[in-house]
Amino acid sequence: MKKLVLIRHGESTWNKENRFTGWTDVDLSDEGRQQATEAAEVLKREGYVFDVAYTSVLKRAIRTLWTVLDGMDLMWIPVHRSWRLNERHYGALQGLNKAETAAKFGEDQVKIWRRSYDIPPPVLTADDPRFPGHDPRYQSLTKEELPLTECLKDTVARFLPLWHDTIAPAIRSGQRVIIAAHGNSLRALVKYLDGVSEADIVELNIPTGMPLVYELDDDLKPLNRYYLGDPEKVKAAMEAVAAQGKKK
């Protein structure tokens, strides 16, 4: 049996402000830093060790990973950063408050934009400063790879090459892997691993800063998955994520 650990970054400053973040490179809040520290403590206490780590090119995920590895005395292991693990791009919604957007467009519409599989938020224009083509970290990407908006289906499509070409072979070779990423890039992986339907993925919420463990067979098919930590705390955190797109 092989184990894979996933962790969504700790609470970010825009999570705290209930804003659509996407590819905007905001940092962790004080609470988010504490969540990452607590994740390191529980992983270390449960005896986890990692050989290699994967994360996005966004600082909230990178800093979460750094904090976890530091707390586990594993800062020396290889870390691979990839834009393919970025949060989904929220298009013209990036920077907007979720509750205010729900009040303007309706909770049902915002839930579709946040959680549906194949309906993207409104698109950006290429001259918008939020377009990633203006960011030097993405200068090696092709025009087709630079999103103006993304639905979860798009996020799955950009993530899977990294999984098939890099992460899955590492797990098969016996390496112990941790992935520190984002709510929707991790939803993309969960959908793929568990075969979650397009309808059911709408209700899947991943809380910040809580390690999610997959037990996999030799073909990388899931045998079990569970969060490390207090089940009631995990449940409350998932419900809080689900409530972010509701009017106040």
Swiss-Prot record:
Organismal lineage: Bacteria, Pseudomonadati, Acidobacteriota, Terriglobia, Bryobacterales
Catalytic activity: (2R)-2-phosphoglycerate = (2R)-3-phosphoglycerate
The family this protein is said to belong to: Belongs to the phosphoglycerate mutase family. BPG-dependent PGAM subfamily.
Pathway: Carbohydrate degradation; glycolysis; pyruvate from D-glyceraldehyde 3-phosphate: step 3/5
Residues that bind substrate: 8-15, 21-22, 60, 87-90, 98, 114-115, 183-184
Name the UniProt record assigns to this protein: 2,3-bisphosphoglycerate-dependent phosphoglycerate mutase
GO molecular function: phosphoglycerate mutase activity
Entry-linked Pfam families: His_Phos_1 (PF00300)
PROSITE patterns: PG_MUTASE (PS00175)
UniProt feature coiled coil, ranges: none
CDD domains linked: HP_PGM_like (cd07067)
Record-linked HAMAP family: PGAM_GpmA
Annotated site (Transition state stabilizer): 182
